[in-house]
Amino acid sequence: PTKQPEVVSQPKVEKEVIALEMIHFEFDKYRLLPETKTILENNAEMLKAHPKVKVIIEGHCDERGTIEYNLALGEKRALSAKNYLVDLGISADRISTISYGKERPLDPRSNEEAWAKNRRDEFKIVE
């Protein structure tokens, strides 16, 4: 009788999920507040621990203002986060930015609570 080849199953390698916390902004501003800097410092530590990971910073605004104005403001918000991460030692070539202005609200309502949620930067991991 011929011997059947032994089937060896490869161990499954769990891919580590890397999540970076979003930051929020004041109305019509792109400056980083102390609490947003703390979040960015934590995000920088995560990026340092995963040096092959790249990130896209998405700048978002609330619904007030024109499309053009909010696209520009969203880009300034994304760039302010990028510049701070670079200052913290993250290579600029690992970070790209995009602005969605007011096109992708987290909360579609028209009130201060919703607007505060929508004024944000989100961090999308690219590997």
Language-model features: locations:
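Periplasmic peptidoglycan-binding/tethering modules of Gram-negative envelope proteins
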Residues: 1-54
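Periplasmic OmpA-like peptidoglycan-binding domain that tethers envelope proteins to the cell wall
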Residues: 58-127
